[in-house]
Amino acid sequence: MLAGCASVDYSVVEPALYEGAIEELQQELRENPDSAEARRSLGLIYLRTGAFRDARTELQAAYDGGVEDPEALFSLGLAHERSGEQRAAIEAYRRYTDLPRTSRYREPMQGRYLLLARQVARAQVRRALAAEATLTDQAPARHVVGVVPLSYQGREPRFEPLGEGLAEMIAIDLAQVQQLRVVERVRLDAVLDELELGASDVVAVASAPRTGRLLGAGRLVAGTYDVLDEETLRLDAALWEMAEAEEPGVESRTDALEQLFAMQKQLVFSLIERMGIRLTAEERARIGEVPTDDLEAFLEFARGLAFERQGQYTEAAQAFSRAAVQDPSFAQATEAQARAQGMQTATGDAASFQRTTLVPAVGPAPIGAAPLSRRLQELSIGLGADDVPGDPDERRPAPEVSDEPPRLPDPPPPPSN
């Protein structure tokens, strides 16, 4: 693994460790080319030994042949990534929702998916900035809505993250409307970071149209809030129509802080009415659902979102955990905790990610000393060795779960929410 002055890649091991196993698997495939299990095992070995393109080929063939266990799906994404195929890696990692929640591969797959999606979004925003002059001639898509964090006008630090949580709830509610598509947080974060804009900057007359163009959004929801004497909440939300030159209309609400969730719902319904959209009974019912009525849990959730936006995933996971403990029925907090933990696991380049997530290989058994399956287990290839206690049989096709993968920014095709 050493070439000239090149550094050693500690994420892989010497192919000689697997020489006998590779020969046996290749022989098996010559005799039975349709053996998806043999291709799976060979692909896992190639991934461990740095033959990434060969690993991708064999693991894709195994997947096409019906192998859908968590280790194979995880390894397929990693093989694509190590081969420099980012879009294909994203497509593989996005299938983390197909894995059992108890699988040890679900969290790193989710984290890597989100990390690569953020990289893609930032690259797209940079390209859009480079070609910004041409964007002014493009008609904005009115059905696409961006929701930015609300800007805090008060002085009490305890309530400063609340704008993140309010924006997230508004975005979740607007996403229930079939006629609308809400800009993903990953793309929103990329635009705000590249423009070096804070929440207060976005609501400025000069900034909002530019932000909307870069988001590809025909509408932009922004606003301000304040908490007076820790008892009274004032919310002001503006709806920018990018195709119109005039300043936006503002929806305002003032009530007791404990009425936060009712106020947020009222704002959403008013914004939708201002857009001229008539909701179905089903859409109205979904929007009316309140994820939590616990203010402290919601504040912790909002803090987690703020940490997450800053790339502080450990602190974000801790805040989301506190929110979930405060209100165990707060499903968004539980999901966000898993997301932040996945991001924490998935940081770094592909080589360091492989090194920290795959179980290191141990010394090889003597070739010919044991059956192939036993030797693969001893070499930590997987074959069940990495299952966590209580997991269902991960060699069987994983059952689908109810949550859907987050939608990626365009391109890369095709992931959709």
Q: Which residues does each PLM region occupy?
A:
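C-terminal/domain-edge helix-coil "capping" segments
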Residues: V8-Y10, P15-E23, D98-P100, Y105-G111, ...
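Post-signal peptide N-terminal segment of mature Sec-exported envelope proteins
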Residues: D9-S41, I45, T49, D64, ...
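Short beta-strand->alpha-helix linker/helix-N-cap micro-motif
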Residues: A139-A208, G218-L233, E244-E251, R286, ...
